[in-house]
Every structure is written in C-alpha cells, then in structure tokens.
Amino acid sequence: MKQILFMDTTLRDGEQSPGVNLNEQEKLQIARQLERLGIHVMEAGFAAASEGDFQSVKRIANTIQNATVMSLARAKESDIRRAYEAVKGAVSPRLHVFLATSDIHMKYKLCMSKEDVLDSIHRSVTLGKSLFPTVQFSAEDATRTARDFLAEAVEVAIRAGANVINIPDTVGYTNPEEYYSLFKYLQESVPSYEKAIFSCHCHDDLGMAVANSLAAVEGGALQVEGTINGIGERAGNAALEEVAVALHIRKDFYQAEPSMTLKEIKATSTLVSRLTGMVVPKNKAIVGANAFAHESGIHQDGVLKEVTTYEIIEPELVGESQNLFVLGKHSGRHAFTEKMKELGYEFTTEERDAVFEAFKKLADRKKEITEEDLRALMLGEAAFAAQQYNITQLQVHFVSNSTQCATVVLKDEEGNVFEDAATGSGSIEAIYNAIQRILGLECELADYRIQSITQGQDALAHVHVELKEGTHQVSGFGVAQDVLEASARAYVHAAGKLKSFIQLVK
C-alpha cells in the first residue's frame, strides 16, 4: 500500500487569505504544530517577498527538526539564492520553484515564448539543484496548459534535477475525471517520470479541491498539497485534514495510507483557526463542531445501539475529545507541566512559570479546566508574551445613558507605563478609544467576533478583531474568561501589529 506524503502550505498559500496577517511568532506556533501533525513538507513562506517573510522562513527552518522546510521562489536567480539563505539551516531544506506554462499566462503575464519558458525552467532548476538537496518544480496553471507542452516542461525540469513535480490546478478549473487523466497522461508521456515524485495542488474555486486531490492520488500522485481547514486566497485550497481522513477511511478503495498523525488534526485545526481568525464552519467535514453530532431521533437511536450505523469516523481518530476536565485548582506545577507536555507543548522555566500562573488564576475562577481550555490558555499567553504592549490595568464604569468610560494602563517591552481614559457608546468602544489614544492610532475596526471556547457560564472567551488603516489590515486575538479583558487583549494585539507596520513604512 503506497504512502501519501503531505505538503502543507498554510504558512504561504493559506496566509494569502484576505484579512489573515500572521506575525513571526504565530507562524512558528503553527509550524511546530504541523510538525506534531506529521506533515512531511511545510512551505514556510516566500523568502524573497519581504524581509519579514525571509526572517520568518529562516526561523522556522532553524527550528523544525522532523519535517522538510521549503521556500517558494520564482524562476529567478535572485529568488532562488534568497530562498537558499533562508532555509539552508534546516535539517531538510527544499526549494519550490515555479513558472507558468499555460498559453494565457505565457502570453499575458510572462510575455515569453514556449522556448523561453523551457529555457527558464532548465536554468532555474539547475541552479536550485546546485544549492539544495531537493528541488520541487511547479508548472503554474498546469490544468489549463496544453498537455503535450506540459509533458515537455516536466521532462525538462526532471532532467535538470527536479525531485518533485507539482501539477497545480491554480484557479480551481479542473474536475476529478480530467485531473486523474492528466496524471495518467504524464505517466505515459514523460520519459523520466519514474525519477520524480508527482504532486497535486488544488484550489477550491468550483468546490472540488478535495475530490480533485483524491483523483490525483488515484492517478499516481504521491504528494498532496493543501492547507489546514482549506484556507487560502479566493475560495481556498484543498483541506489536508479531509484528504488524509478520506484516504484512511477508504484505504480499501485508494490503496493508500496518509503519512499523518491523525489524532493531531483537531488541535491543528483549532490553532490555525484561532491564529488566523478564520472560523471553521460548524458543518465542515472532519473538524466542524457538528461533524460528530446527531440531531435526528432515528440517527441518535441508531448510534446508541451501534455507533457505526451513522458514524464512519471515530471522533478520537482525529483528536476530538469529549472535553472532560483534566485539571483543577488543586493541581500542582508538576501535574500541569506533564499535561502540557502530553498536549505537545514545551517551554523554558520562565515560560512555564508564566503560563502556570495564568492557569492558577483561571482555576480559581473556573471549576473544571479542560484540554481545550489549556490549549486556549497557551495560545493566549504566547500571544500576550510576544506583544509590544501588554495590559496591566483595565477599568470600566458607567457615565450616563449608554456612555461608558474606560481607563487603560499599558506597559511596553522596556517597562514604560502608559495610561489614558476615553468614553464610548458601550464598554468595548470606550476601551478601544482609550487604547487608540495611548498608541496614537486612528484606525477602523473592520471586524469583531467573539467565541466561547468551552461550554458553561465560566467558559473562556476568544475575541478576534481586525483593524484597518488605509489599505493595510491586521488581525489580533485575545483569550480571557472576562469578555472585556479578552476584547482589550485582542485590540492591543492587533494595534501593536498595525503600529509596527506604520513605523516600518515611514
């Protein structure tokens, strides 16, 4: 039975989702969780895009131990050398070089002839192979490329040293039958086919990204590319968790097994959702809140009698726990540390002490602490520690009618304290006005969302905000049991990002 490898591009293609703006620390958090998920290759970013991207890719490359770290690059020498500088410190570095091969791209975007494109592929892959142990070549817009020319381009890439060949459905145009036949065509038409691993990369514009990916596996693809939760530009990418579970459940049909630690799927999905601010739909396959819920009386009766009557996936397979309480206010530092290690978290003594203190404060107010609470707590404290400014005091009081007054005290990384007060039509507006006054910002609140992390009146709140100034938009989140505190944390998180961006472009 063949093993299917997964290439995750959440940190590159996924971050291109409108409104998603991850900082370096957040990208590193996701990368570490992808490593726990057992992802074979992670595309850490596009090193040549900006200095910020370069530094993020480099830090991930120098941190990850059990996965290949890859940077995207155009078929340009400067891009390829920049990618090398970013990932050369990785345990297993890889270059991902791409060039469009469809007539429409060659004519209108590249302004290149077929001969020019083939020459560029040869030169870029040859250079990449002189620097990297493995090189992946992507024929951008492959599904709208003339098949004979695509086969020619792929052959040139393999002969130049490409180890992996990606056949992307860049605009989500193809369907499963066409995609399957395309892989079969290449298998028959590319002389050096056996010398490379073939990969698929599907977009969801017509809602067929997962189906197309599975068809590619049938057609001979040994690597599947996509993102967690299917996030990405436009309608998104193939959701890797859906492809992986489909292969596992239907291995009888596909004769393939996913090389992924499936029990880490739920935790990975939740982390990506909270850091990006992209809410997972309740009815989403595998990771949606209703994925294992049964409303119909007939279905409920069947499940109670024999679970397989209506449930083809065991919730535990993907790490969907029953969320039973695991710790309480009497739990000690050792029990807390061991539980966090079990969940995959590692920290320095200083980080452990800070998170344990936050845990004890929560345990004093919340009777039962669940695994979901612990993950949220860790996420919130990590963001809190990485911020330029942290909230040290927050006070809100009623003025008149619907007017509220908020006093906010912030401390920066150097220990400087800033205090101001402001009024607003409600507590949230007053808090946000006060923070704006302290930071000297004039921005628009583009989005505000609040979610309950667990059930019950004492549940933690997760607040997501998006701030916009001109054409630049950033997001932030905050986690706390108190809604106002979570809201303030989220705003400070986003405002700090925005202030950094403004200072950078000045």
UniProtKB/Swiss-Prot annotation:
EC assignment: the record states 2.3.3.13
One GO cellular component assignment for this chain's record is: cytoplasm
HAMAP family xrefs: LeuA_type1
Segments traversing the membrane: none
- What is its cofactor? Mn(2+)
Which segments carry the region annotation Regulatory domain?
A: 390-506
Q: Which GO terms describe its biological process?
A: L-leucine biosynthetic process
Gene this protein is translated from: leuA
Describe the task this protein carries out.
Catalyzes the condensation of the acetyl group of acetyl-CoA with 3-methyl-2-oxobutanoate (2-ketoisovalerate) to form 3-carboxy-3-hydroxy-4-methylpentanoate (2-isopropylmalate).
The catalysed reaction is: 3-methyl-2-oxobutanoate + acetyl-CoA + H2O = (2S)-2-isopropylmalate + CoA + H(+)
The pathway it acts in is:
Amino-acid biosynthesis; L-leucine biosynthesis; L-leucine from 3-methyl-2-oxobutanoate: step 1/4
> Any idea what this protein is called?
2-isopropylmalate synthase
Assembly description? Homodimer.
- UniProt-annotated binding residues for Mn(2+): D13, H201, H203, N237
Species: Bacillus cereus (strain Q1)
Single GO term (MF): manganese ion binding
InterPro entries cross-referenced by the UniProt entry = 2-IPM_HCS-like, 2-isopropylmalate_synth_dimer, AIPM/Hcit_synth_CS, Aldolase_TIM, LeuA/HCS_post-cat, LeuA_allosteric_dom_sf, LeuA_bact_synth, PYR_CT
Instruction: Note the superkingdom of the native organism.
Output: Bacteria
Pfam families reported for this sequence: HCS_D2 (PF22617), HMGL-like (PF00682), LeuA_dimer (PF08502)
Stated family: Belongs to the alpha-IPM synthase/homocitrate synthase family. LeuA type 1 subfamily.
Subcellular location field = Cytoplasm
What keywords does the record list, in alphabetical order?
Amino-acid biosynthesis, Branched-chain amino acid biosynthesis, Cytoplasm, Leucine biosynthesis, Manganese, Metal-binding, Transferase
Specify the Pyruvate carboxyltransferase domain's residue ranges: 4-266
